[in-house]
Amino acid sequence: MSICKEKNGARNENAGAAEYRNIIAVTNRKLCERPFFEQVERICQMHPKALILREKDLSESAYEAMAGQVLEICGRYDTPCMLHSFVEVARRLHHPYIHLPLFLLEEYCGKLNDFRIVGSSIHSPEEAVRAQKAGATYVTAGHVYVTDCKKGLPPRGLEFLKEVCTKVTIPVYAIGGIHAGTGQIQEVMDCGASGGCIMSEMMKI
């Protein structure tokens, strides 16, 4: 299942969508230069493929309060929103899109039938296979390029990404050191990925 498929059909596209339609925005409120919800709305106005609300350091109650507001903003722009880690929050909000670290995905294996889209973060071809077996409908794979988020750690590179893409039949999204407008999105798609994920840049656009 593609992460960009919506129950009510195709999304409208405009000039912003033409640039961002293959980009998944990943949030990190600590990087914002403006109020967080204002930044989320700004991102949605660019019509990315989806948004992952990653603020997993929050308490469950704080995350739920934030998620309710973010889902309302995303809904106004028809931007798919993946909640992150908090499965029960997603259920209480009747939201069928969730993204989980691999260890949580495997813990919940067989217990996520009420979710339409289930993503997972992986860091090796073997983990990608495990994620698909555990029920993931897409994976994010990284880190592909040099990134400040992983200072001192060498990137896994495009050959890693190619191998991941050959090991699974679900969509793969590259993550790590990706910037819009640099040709990197096309580069990762040429490796077989369905697009790329961007955090830092999307928190500052």
Regions found by a protein language model. Give the residues of each.
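Catalytic cores of alpha/beta
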Residues: 81-96, 123-134, 167-168, 173-174, ...
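Structural preference for beta-strand elements that scaffold enzyme active sites
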Residues: 22-24, 49-52, 80-82, 96-99, ...
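Alpha-helix-loop-beta-strand connector modules within alpha/beta enzyme cores
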Residues: 64-82, 110-124, 154-177
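N-terminal active-site wall of soluble small-molecule enzyme domains
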Residues: 50-114
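Glycine/Thr-rich beta-alpha phosphate-binding loop at enzyme active sites
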Residues: 93-95, 119-166
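Glycine-rich phosphate-binding active-site loops on the catalytic face of alpha/beta enzymes
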Residues: 102-110, 140-152, 177-180, 185-205
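Acidic (Asp/Glu)-rich catalytic clusters
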Residues: 40-47, 75-76, 91, 110-113, ...
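Active-site mouth loops of central-metabolism enzymes
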Residues: 20-37, 117-121, 178-181
